Design a protein with these regions (language model features):
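Conserved beta-strand -> loop -> alpha-helix junction used to position metal-binding or nucleic-acid-contacting
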Residues: 135-148
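Conserved non-catalytic scaffold segment of RNase H-like nuclease domains
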Residues: 16-138, 153, 159-173
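Acidic, divalent-metal-coordinating active-site segment for phosphoryl/phosphodiester hydrolysis
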Residues: 175-188
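Generic alpha-helical structural context detector
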Residues: 146-149, 164, 184-187
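Active-site phosphate/pyrophosphate-handling residues
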Residues: 123, 146, 180
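Intrinsically disordered, low-complexity repeat tracts
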Residues: 2-4
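Acidic two-metal-ion nuclease catalytic site recognized across multiple nuclease folds
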Residues: 7, 11-30, 185-202
């Protein structure tokens, strides 16, 4: 990925450490800005996003959030039992392509995307962008699941378990709540890494 994230570039590697100080060059002179991202999907296809949540982190604080239901490309919602979202809930919602301008504006100053189990959310983001003819996203990703496994000795490192460990409120499988929780988890892990003098690579 390019040093500043965003669109374009020719890299595709999963991102740097959770104690990341920023990209090389000019970007290194400004603090990184993170956006925790969470998708819920309607079916087994990664382009079936039916909800998205984002929470922006700058200098150790959550500074903004964004949430929307999304109308998926197919009417059959298979995972209502997971997230509670039905076709009736999303049939009048914007498609990913229609929502994208608002999401892109939110991500305008973001240098890194963050997710708990980042490969899943990255795959959904890439598939949705491809489905609507949008440029391939090139933000480096930080995976708080991988980071928590390295940093915390817990029986489980699922999002709800790690949130219980830190006392982070969570309405699990609500994309807005999951994104906000991942952002708070990032802040906790960064603080803990700094105190230990470590650079935790997700």
């Amino acid at each position: 990925a390019s040093g500043e994230g965003g669109w374009g570039g020719n890299g595709d590697d999963m991102a740097k450490g959770i104690n990341e100080k920023g990209a090389s060059g000019e970007a290194a002179e400004r603090p990184p800005v993170y956006a925790a991202l969470d998708f819920e999907t309607a079916d087994y296809q990664p382009d079936s996003a039916c909800a998205v949540g984002l929470a922006k982190v700058s200098e150790g604080r959550i500074v903004d959030t964004l949430y929307s239901l999304i109308r998926p490309p197919r009417h059959r919602v298979l995972f209502t039992w997971v997230h509670g979202i039905t076709w009736k809930d999303v049939c009048d919602s914007p498609t990913f392509g229609e929502f994208w301008p608002q999401m892109a504006a939110f991500l305008g100053d973001v240098t890194h995307l963050v997710a708990h189990n980042a490969p899943f959310d990255r795959r959904v983001l890439e598939a949705c962008c491809q489905a609507y003819g949008l440029p391939h996203p090139q933000w480096p990703f930080i995976c708080t699941l991988r980071a928590s496994r390295k940093q915390l000795k817990l029986p489980s490192h699922k999002l709800d378990a790690v949130c219980r460990h830190y006392g982070i409120p969570l309405d699990h499988h609500h994309a807005g709540s999951d994104a906000l929780a991942a952002a708070q988890l990032l802040i906790h892990l960064q603080r803990q890494a700094r105190e230990a003098g470590k650079d935790v690579t997700p």
